[in-house]
Amino acid sequence: MERALLIIDGTVLVLRPWFAKVSAPWAVARNQLRKEAAKYTHVAVVIDRTMDTFRRKLDPRYKAHRPPASAELIAHFNRFEEEVTKMGIALFGSLEVEADDLAATLTRHAVAAGLPVLIQAPDKDLFQLIRDAAPSVRVIAPKKGWDINEAGVMERLGVTPSQVTDFQALVGDATDGVIGVAGVGAKTAAALLTARGTLDAIYADLDGLVTLPIRGAKTLPRKLLAGKDDAMLARRLVTLRADVDMGADPLAKCEMP
């Protein structure tokens, strides 16, 4: 077994076979979990229990376009949770935060304990947690062929992990209903952050942006000023919480038998 903490997004694990119209999504998810869990000394499953988290309170538009889960799907989630518990694998869920926040908090505990982390979830929001320095943190998604380190973040987004939240604040995230700055796309956002480093530094000198070798640079001060409130709110929405109360020594709960 590899000495590392594997964090699996259980919600995604159930949803994938559900959307594939498999007859028993919970069973497919359980079997996949069993296979992956056998490889690591520490394993945790994190799940979303509600969409009405603190982010929805910050912005009612957050994930507002997503329909509520059907009774049948909820039954599959419940059965999967029962199976996880039977397997003796740590399961974490919350009515206040999302699975990604639980993953971020577990990652903080693991890094502090010198334990490498692998987060299995096809979610760019998690890129902000990635680090190459020991103990490393990587985001993996076998179905997508992901095994992403710092270079992988740069390759995909054009920024470093520490810049991911500022990048998302600029471009937004239609998947989650996060509104960024209108007229600022991924390439422009990456170029701005490469030149200025942070979102705050960009806004500290809007007039100076016109001299940057970026296509449409002369229009950037106007666009960024108009979208400032959206960008600042977006940054709050996409920043993962790593301070969730998960009880005493949550890492100990993740130790595999």
State each model region's role.
Residues 2, 36-40, 44, 133, ...:
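Non-catalytic nucleic-acid-binding/docking modules located in mid-to-C-terminal regions
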